[in-house]
Amino acid sequence: MPIIEESTMTYAEACRYFPGGVNSPIRACIPVGILPPIVSSAHRDIFIDSFGKTFIDFCGSWGSLIHGHGHPKILDVICNSASQGTSYGLTSENEISLAATLFSCLEFEDHKVRFVSSGTEATMTAVRLACATTGRSIMIKFLGCYHGHADVLLKGISIDESNIHQVPHIVDTYFSGNPYLPLNLILPYNDIQIFKEVMLQVGERVACVIFEPIAINMGVVLPKPGFIEGVITISRRFAALTIMDEVVTGFRMGIRGVRSIMDVDSDITVYGKILGGGMPVAAFLAHHRIMDHLLPLGQVFQAGTLSGNPIAMAVGKASLELCREVDFYPKLENLAQSFFAPIEEVICHQGFPVSLVRAGSMFSFFFRETPPTNLREVQECDHQMFGVFYRHVFAQGVYLSPAPMEASFLSSVHSKENLAYTQNVLIDSLMKTFGSL
């Protein structure tokens, strides 16, 4: 039986048990029109599907695996920790050890942290904490930035630039009066003037402003110079708390997260992915004056049976220790530069209407002449052409994140051989997509 038929049957079996055959929707690969691979095993920079085909992996569990699949140190930690128990439901030594390592990396003083199991839990609770701390009931987020699938983070009002002066009316109409159910205002990403105008009108009622320091969940969209800094400065002018969502960017470009490359300082910061090293770990942290509003010291509720799971905590510490190794980030940046340079050269030389945008080892291909700066420009990209490109890449055993509005990732263990092969595949696929081959 041909492989494609076997693969179809396997996916059909998955669909018997899971809605859409998956436990997270993007895994269905619908935006790129491929049958989703079903993984059998993974090692370093590759995974093998259930029919033995090998793929070079540039998704890396959506950026979690900066150290690749099955790093020996992480595997050792998992085995050693599991031998001491899999879950306690009590505070463990491993939690304390990871917290100490985390604060040492970030160079924070007078802060406290709460560990949870997912980025959604972390951002959801951070918003709840901000509302209770300030006693206010408006949250501002930016269009195209994803902060998890809690209701408070999915719902919202999209404010058009031409309707900016209608904001007070909208707020009064939809204001719930419940500090735990804030009104969600959504503003355009990268437009500091609109943000300033909105804050001038409703700033004294804003509990928090949540943002990605580098937008990742509409593809890699870089902030304009001064945008993030301006958001933080203006927010503080109105005593609104800032929540910096570093679930993806945290520890990706430096051991202090984006603070390694940007002069930013939020009130609450959220981490995940790399922090867990492939295990379900996320965290939110802030100055103790804010964090002590959480139960059992304060009145803000958060709980989780598996929060601070001892195995996950041990792996998290191992992940951070690997990131702290000498020249870890310079080596990763050099790897990225040498990998992307030939591809960028071909795009420029051929005049392809493609923008390869990267932030360190995170990257996206946008099928448009210039890099997008907001969601509207991302939506204007030629997603159909991206799908054609993606299918050429996938057919040759390279797995990018399967959507035009998602980021892909390099790891520290991508081999020179696999990177050289992938360079050729990406260039070949671009040429085929635009009919140059």
UniProtKB/Swiss-Prot annotation:
EC annotation from Swiss-Prot or TrEMBL: 5.4.3.8
Gene3D superfamilies named in the record: Aspartate Aminotransferase, domain 1, Type I PLP-dependent aspartate aminotransferase-like (Major domain)
GO terms of biological process kind: protoporphyrinogen IX biosynthetic process
Reaction it catalyzes: (S)-4-amino-5-oxopentanoate = 5-aminolevulinate
Compartment list: Cytoplasm
Modification N6-(pyridoxal phosphate)lysine occurs at: K273
Primary enzyme class: isomerase
GO cellular component assignments: cytoplasm
Isomerase in keyword set: yes
UniProt main location, coarse: cytoplasm
GO molecular function: glutamate-1-semialdehyde 2,1-aminomutase activity; pyridoxal phosphate binding; transaminase activity
Pfam families (UniProt xref): Aminotran_3 (PF00202)
Disulfide partners: none
Recorded metabolic or biological pathway in which this protein acts: Porphyrin-containing compound metabolism; protoporphyrin-IX biosynthesis; 5-aminolevulinate from L-glutamyl-tRNA(Glu): step 2/2
Keyword annotations: Cytoplasm, Isomerase, Porphyrin biosynthesis, Pyridoxal phosphate
Stored NCBIfam families: PRK00062.1, PRK00615.1
Quaternary structure note: Homodimer.
Similarity-based family: Belongs to the class-III pyridoxal-phosphate-dependent aminotransferase family. HemL subfamily.
Stated name of the protein: Glutamate-1-semialdehyde 2,1-aminomutase
Organism: Chlamydia abortus (strain DSM 27085 / S26/3)
The organism's taxonomic lineage, starting at the top: Bacteria, Pseudomonadati, Chlamydiota, Chlamydiia, Chlamydiales
